[in-house]
From Swiss-Prot:
Stated name of the protein: ABC multidrug transporter atrH
Disruption phenotype: Does not significantly affect miconazole susceptibility.
Disulfide cysteine pairs (residue numbers): none
GN (gene name): atrH
Region of interest (Disordered), residue spans: 1-45, 61-89
Induction comment from the UniProt entry of this chain: Expression is slightly up-regulated in the presence of miconazole.
UniProt keywords, alphabetically: ATP-binding, Cell membrane, Glycoprotein, Membrane, Nucleotide-binding, Repeat, Transmembrane, Transmembrane helix, Transport
Biased composition (Basic and acidic residues): 1-10
Length: 1481
């Protein structure tokens, strides 16, 4: 029964935030229910106004006499009931006190409320009911369809989601939204809250907020209507206290109580809300996420609720916010909302699944949705009567909420006798009944009256604007939805940014350490360069490396930005700050992190290598390096901000980085650039920096000559005028090369460009900064589609192809075709009846937390018998899942004691395989279909002795039994594009049943987060399995009384893993109730939910206290003694049973290793085929960069610079390596997490089969990619022309292809080796990048073995790229004549009286140079090389070593594979030894 409003508002804790400027005074609690209700009761408007005035007067008198007058709770904490940090804190008293103070000065604290009315509300989207799955072969058809859609010729179908909704919610009221998943609950809430991203509203839609239009509310007053989604997204590095303090500060009003600073206000509000929601103990705990340990899941949910609460919106839309909370905490949350609405006049619209009667009774109104139709709107207390009068029946103990939702499920609604042909059946019939009802007519009249009372643009809007304006800080625009000014937003985001930095220093520290190591390595390679012409190339290479590493230091910022983007978008919707304010602050926050990285790296690099050691030149070097880092940081951030998904950003970014590298001006000098790509050099900021660094190093400097031409025997006494220095820019007769001339001749660089370039760089910096800030403010992430099923092409069932205009993308296939329960039982006969009994005694489980032993389970006893369904319940954190994991033998750490026996015998290796474990998370391979997932489980987990045909037949039985025929061919996909929540849960159960478990099934929270109908269907399914001989142990929280009736026994745990009860439940749970009542608990009320009553009895419900220690009561009870006795008896009797023969000879696994390998390999091949985005991203990296490199180095001549360019073209081809590695790692990690979390504990297959299949699947694809990479790179550069002189064009072409193939295979196996033992792909990518850089530095291109210090020679030998580059260069250019370009020809005047031939013949013969004009007697022209082999010898490459190198490369590939398997075993395979030792100890 619903409590009267006054009682309800004072029942339990008053636990919700009050915005001091939101809502009417406290009297709202005593005002009448609604306009509609009053008119219905015959009270006229005039009379109502009088009653309201009277109530307000009485309320004010009661406040004045409350004894809290004048006490400011923000400053005065003398009253412990007003101090949120006190145990005696009373939130109701705090609320009353605050409202009393603010109501005395209505001018300073104007109030605002926002009720809502809606008429003709129609929302729709575009899409299809079912889509076909993209594969490598059919993705082109999708692309064609997308192009047609782009030009307006697509077959986009309008899908109506909400149809003709009508209703109104007054300020101070609460509306509950009921409907099954897919009925449009979320869409309705989003529409009211203005979150229509990807949705459209019909033109006639009329939504008003007490005189404010929909458009104005969601622009000027954005953040005043809030939508709180199901998901929890927060910065994991922040503590819960800091997260909430940020929200409190962002919405802290300007019109605070006198003497209260903004910080005092925010801190106090934060403390109050945390106290109200029971979060005070998490104040200094990190929020965390899946990867970072932090608060628990339920606490994280409450942090989200607290954040929304602190924003103080007058209208709040809560979407399934109780998901993951136990029933008592969920009730407490709804009561808190009730208090907020009663005291402050705020309005709450709440979609809730599995609403208990106590929760339902808190609400004023209810709206019931059925596949996008409204079938009821009105008072919550009248809804049940409305449908019972229609002809439906509500079973005893079924909650009103469950009854209303069950009406929308054909299999679950019950019709009263005699009404079978009178009740509506389809959604349209229900909607028609509602439209023709008297209740609707009354509702329309009430909406009319509501809108007349609050006309658009009337006084209510003025009042609202005034209240909002009073809160805003100075310098805030009148039309701005934000409370703070722009500068204050930046300051606030800055504070949070530094807290995030402090919370996770690992990234900064690892970057500083990593860059320092890299600087030391590079500096040691180029250690103390001499100041002769020999160091020219080395200095250029060093500066090239330095500027690239500075430029690309910020590339990973793209990833960080994408991780925080959903959080920033959420806060923007809450109107906490501009996204651009966060963008600016994140740039500033990163500066202190960038500074140490930059200083350490550049200092080491500059001074160790003997670059120009003067303060001025170092300053110029550092200035350009830092400016380049900042410019490129903005460019990468801009790319991330512009792209609407991370995948969209990755391939373009890597190609963009490669373009920047090539067109910096070192790998291909400006004079050699082809006109079609020359422009890329102009728009490359790094090119300007590189030019300035070269000018800074070489300009105004003379380098002594290291080698003269001619030199050697006979030339020692030749005059200097007849010699020339060997190098570009040399002049005969000079014993040095002038730096300025070298820059001009070799690079076309001029000293006058030094500061011009800095100006251009600043231009790039400013432009990219503005572009990033603008993009971050304007570009939104991609909206998700509505829920649709995806099928393999050609297998879309006929019913799914028909897209009706009524179809609902939230769940188009809400299955009206569900069969009646009795028809399904025919298929259950296939289930194997279990005979074994699983029993355990005195089970304890201890783990170490921060060096302290902590007991998770404390002497737990129990058993599960075939044909029984046992519930495992407990308070949050009681160790329910831990007990399930310990019993299922899935624990890999900690100390376990006690006995866990099957028929009196210890569990053997096959135990995990013989049990099914239905996990809470529905983890499945996204690309597989439902049938394939079941077949995979059946093939691997059923005994090898069972024929394949029999296994497949059993899968069909499972599909029928679980009613999955309609979507058996559907692809699992991701939520929204694939199976919905219920279908996923059924598949999770199906996968375990398909394995034919011999012993029992464990279920972990199978109903968590489901609506009551889905929860009921899952419980009915478990009951059905049990009735056919299965044994099931199932953890459950938030169960309704009806759900609990499905269970036979209960094991209840209190905090610390102590048993409170283990035994039968009895009919209507009488046995359980009797146990507690006999032991002195209060009586259970007749209509109460016994599960919730029990939580209150043992003190687990918030606000309840136990009058005795119930675990102690159990310990000394007669019932426990009986349990102990029965366990002892079982142990003795069951041992007498004959032991069944072993069904499989493979112990741990059902199938032999070779069979496991082939089944796994088939699945991963299928997965890759169905991931066209991955395969085509790989193809793009193997086509676009090679093609680009090919056309950049188009038809290189065999000049000295030409050969160097060809060498760099190989070097640049290697640069695609890290991108290919990065692409592969997330796919491996996805497969691995599925294996480790679900398939390994189930003993489906061995880790060896998993690893080998994951390595082998990559090889064919990479071999295929070698083909385009080879053709796009080898032929445009023209390397094949070098084979003409030796007449080996075909042979060398084939060998080159082999080398490209080896490179691709090496890439593939190297990726597997790097990710094998490492958790996160990002970490593995970073380590792979470091190792790649090392291989590249020591491969002999940037620094030849002659230049390398002796210490590093071993690295040159160890680097696989040394052999790869050596082989590719040898095959590409060996044996061809060299033709010097004009700037490479040396001009030497012969001594008087000698011609060129006579003077230089001895030298050219000895040095194998070419004399171009032997007969001339002046200006002798010498090309210092005659064949390409001389160039190769200079970098220690011999053609004769080609096949030795190929052999060594194959050894590397084998090594990578073996290392991948070994590392996986070493790091990730649980070692049983550790656990056994722990047990012994």
């Amino acid at each position: 029964m619903a409590l009267p409003r006054e009682e309800r508002s004072l029942h339990g804790h008053a636990n919700i935030h009050v915005n001091q400027t939101t809502g009417p005074a406290i009297d709202k609690a005593e005002s009448s229910d609604t306009i509609g209700a009053d008119s219905e009761d015959g009270i006229e408007q005039e009379g109502q106004a009088k009653i309201t005035t009277l109530a307000r007067t009485l309320s004010r008198i009661s406040q004045t006499n409350s004894g809290t007058e004048g006490l400011n709770p923000f400053l005065n904490t003398s009253d412990p009931e007003l101090d949120p940090n006190s145990d005696q804190f009373n939130s109701r008293k705090w609320t009353k006190t605050l409202l009393h103070i603010t109501s005395r000065d209505p001018e300073r604290y104007p109030r605002r409320t926002a009720g809502v009315s809606f008429r003709n509300l129609n929302a729709f989207g575009y899409g299809t009911a079912a889509d076909y799955q993209a594969t490598v072969s059919n993705v082109w058809l999708k692309a064609a369809g997308w192009l047609r859609g782009l030009f307006g010729n697509g077959n986009k179908v309008r899908i109506d989601i909400l149809r003709n909704f009508e209703g109104f919610v007054n300020s101070g009221e609460m509306l509950v939204v009921l409907g099954r998943p897919g009925s449009g609950c979320s869409t309705f809430l989003k529409t009211i809250a203005g979150e229509t991203h990807g949705l459209w509203l019909d033109k006639g839609t009329d939504i008003q907020y007490q005189g404010i239009s929909w458009d104005e509310m969601h622009s000027r007053f954005r953040g005043e209507v809030m939508y709180q989604a199901e998901t929890e997204i927060h910065f994991p590095q922040l503590t819960a206290g800091d997260t909430l303090l940020f929200a409190a500060k962002a919405r802290a009003p300007a019109n605070r109580l006198p003497g209260v600073s903004r910080d005092q206000y925010a801190t106090h509000m934060r403390d109050v809300v945390m106290a109200m929601l029971g979060l005070t103990h998490t104040m200094n705990t990190l929020v965390g996420n899946e990867f970072i340990r932090g608060v628990s899941g339920g606490e994280r949910k409450r942090v989200s609720i607290a954040e929304t609460t602190l924003c103080g919106s007058p209208l709040q839309c809560w979407d399934n916010s109780t998901r993951g909370l136990d029933s008592s905490t969920a009730l407490e949350f709804v009561k808190n909302l009730r208090l907020s609405t009663d005291y402050t006049g705020s309005t709450a619209i709440v979609a809730i699944y599995q609403a208990s009667q106590a929760i339902y009774d808190v609400f004023d109104k209810v709206i019931v949705l059925y596949e996008g139709r409204q079938i009821y709107f009105g008072r919550a207390r009248d809804a049940k009567r409305f449908f019972i009068e229609m002809g439906f029946d509500c079973p005893e103990r079924q909650t009103t909420g469950d009854f209303l939702t069950s009406l929308t499920s054909p299999t679950e609604r019950l019709v009263r006798k005699g009404y079978e042909h009178l009740v509506p059946r389809t959604p349209d019939e229900f909607a028609a009944r509602w439209r023709d009802s008297l209740e609707r007519k009354q509702l329309l009249a009430d909406i009319e009256a509501f809108q007349n009372e609050f006309p658009l643009g009337g006084s209510k809007k003025e009042e609202f604007s005034r209240s909002r304006a009073a809160e805003k800080a100075k310098n805030t625009r009148a039309s701005s939805p934000y409370t703070l000014s722009y500068s204050m937003q930046i300051k606030l985001c800055l504070q949070r940014g530094f807290l995030r930095l402090k919370g996770d220093m690992s990234m900064t520290l690892s970057t500083v350490i990593g860059n320092s190591i890299l600087a030391l390595i590079i500096s040691s390679v180029f250690y103390n360069l001499n100041e002769t012409t020999d160091s020219y190339f080395s200095r250029g290479a060093l500066l090239f490396f330095a500027i690239l590493l500075n430029a690309f230091a910020s590339a990973l910022e793209m990833l960080t930005l994408w991780q925080q983007r959903p959080i920033v978008e959420k806060h923007d919707k809450y109107a906490l700050y501009h996204p651009s304010a966060e963008a600016i602050s994140s740039l500033i926050v990163d500066l202190p992190a960038k500074a140490p990285v930059s200083i350490v790296f550049n200092l080491i690099l500059y001074f160790m290598t003997n670059l120009r050691r003067t303060p001025g030149h170092f300053f110029v070097f550092y200035l350009f390096s830092v400016t380049t880092t900042l410019t490129m940081s903005n460019v990468f951030r801009w790319i991330a901000a512009v792209s609407r998904s991370l995948a969209q950003a990755e391939v373009p970014a890597s190609i963009f980085m490669m373009i920047l590298m090539i067109y910096t001006g070192f790998t291909i000098p400006v004079r050699d650039m082809h006109p079609w790509f020359r422009w890329l050099n102009y728009i490359n900021p790094i090119a300007y920096s590189f030019e300035s660094l070269m000018i800074n190093e070489f300009a105004g400097r003379k380098f002594h000559c290291a080698t003269y031409v001619p030199s050697g025997p006979g030339y020692d006494n030749a005059p200097l005028d007849s010699k020339i220095c060997s190098g570009k820019g040399a002049v005969a007769g000079q014993d040095y090369i002038d730096g300025d001339r070298y820059l001009e001749v070799a690079f076309e660089y001029y000293p006058s460009h030094l500061w011009r370039n800095f100006g251009i760089l600043l231009g790039f910096l400013f432009f990219s900064l503005v572009a990033y800030i603008v993009a971050s403010e304007l570009v939104r992430a991609k909206p998700s589609k509505g829920e649709i099923l995806v099928f393999p092409r050609g297998k879309i069932p006929a019913f799914a192809k028909k897209v009706h205009r009524e179809a609902d993308p939230e769940d188009v296939l809400t299955s009206e075709k569900l069969k009646v329960g009795s028809e399904q039982d025919d298929h259950v006969g296939a289930i194997v009846k279990q005979t074994s009994i699983f029993h355990w005694q005195d089970v304890c489980y201890d783990i170490k937390i921060k060096g302290q032993d902590r007991r998770i389970l404390d002497h737990v006893d129990g058993w599960v018998k075939p044909g029984t369904l046992t519930a495992l319940m407990g308070v949050t954190g009681a160790g329910k899942t831990s007990l399930l994991d310990v019993l299922a033998n899935r624990v890999t750490m900690g100390v376990i004691t006690g006995e866990m026996l099957v028929d009196g015998r210890m569990r053997d290796d096959s135990f995990q395989r013989k049990t099914g474990y239905v996990q809470q998370q529905d983890l499945h391979l996204e690309t597989s279909t439902v049938r394939e997932a079941l077949i995979f489980s059946a093939l691997l987990r059923q005994p090898a002795s069972t024929p394949r045909k029999e296994k497949l037949a059993y899968v069909e039985e499972v599909i029928k039994m679980l009613n999955m025929e309609e979507y058996a061919e559907a692809v699992v996909g991701v939520l929204g594009e694939g199976l919905n929540v219920e279908q996923r849960k059924r598949l999770t159960i199906g996968v375990e049943i398909a394995a034919k478990p011999d012993l029992l099934l464990f279920f972990d929270e199978p109903t968590s987060g489901l609506d009551s109908q889905t929860a009921w269907s899952i419980c009915s399914l478990m009951r059905k399995l049990v009735d056919h001989g299965q044994a099931i142990l199932c953890t459950i929280h938030q169960p309704s009384a009806i759900l609990m009736q499905q269970f036979d026994r209960l094991l209840f745990l209190a905090k610390g893993g102590k048993t409170v009860y283990f035994g039968d439940l009895g009919p209507n749970m009488r046995t359980l109730i009797k146990y507690f009542e006999d032991k002195g608990s209060p009586k259970c009320p007749p209509n109460a939910n016994p599960a919730e009553w029990m939580l209150e009895v043992i003190g687990a419900a918030p606000g309840s206290r136990a009058d005795q220690d119930w675990s102690d009561v159990w310990k000394h009870s007669r019932e426990r003694a009986q349990v102990q006795q029965e366990l002892l008896q079982m142990k003795q009797e069951l041992l007498q049973r004959p032991q069944p023969p072993r069904t499989a000879g493979y112990g741990e696994f059902a199938m032999p290793l070779w069979a496991q390998f082939f089944i796994c390999l088939q699945r991963v091949f299928q997965q890759y085929w169905r991931c066209p985005s991955y395969i085509y991203a790989k193809a793009a990296m193997c086509i676009i960069p090679p093609l680009f490199i090919g056309f950049t180095f188009w038809r290189e001549p065999t000049s000295i610079q030409g050969m160097q360019n060809e060498m760099f073209s190989i070097f640049m081809l290697l640069v695609i390596f890290p991108n290919l590695v990065q692409q592969m790692m997330p796919y491996f990690a996805m497969q691995r997490s599925l294996y480790e979390v679900r398939e390994r504990p189930s003993k489906a297959y061995s880790w060896k089969a998993f690893m080998l299949a994951s390595i082998v699947v990559e090889l064919p694809w990479n071999m295929l990619m070698a083909v385009p990479a080879y053709f796009c790179w080898y032929y445009p550069i023209g390397l094949f022309r070098n084979a003409y002189p030796t007449d080996s064009v075909t042979e060398r072409g084939g060998t080159m292809f082999l080398l490209v193939l080896i490179f691709m295979l090496f890439t593939s196996t190297f990726s597997s080796m790097m990710i094998a033992g490492i958790d996160h792909p990002e970490t593995a990518s970073n380590i792979a990048q470091l190792m790649f850089s090392m291989c590249l530095i020591f491969c002999g291109v940037l620094a030849s073995p002659d230049v390398l210090p002796r210490f590093w020679i071993f690295m040159w030998r160890a680097s696989p790229f040394s052999y790869l580059v050596g082989s590719v260069l040898a095959v590409g250019i060996a044996g061809a004549p060299v033709h010097c370009s004009d700037i490479e020809v040396l001009h030497i005047p012969p001594p008087g009286g000698q011609n060129c031939s006579g003077y230089l013949e001895a030298f050219t013969t000895m040095a194998k140079s070419t004399l171009l004009n032997p007969e001339a007697d002046s200006d002798c022209q010498v090309c210092s090389l005659s064949t390409t082999d001389q160039f190769l010898a200079g970098v220690h490459i011999k053609y004769s070593e080609l096949w030795r190198n190929v052999g060594i490369l194959f050894v590397y590939i084998v090594f990578n594979t073996v290392a991948a398997v070994f590392l996986y075993w070493l790091v990730r395979v649980p070692k049983k030894r550790a656990l056994k030792k722990a047990k012994k100890e």
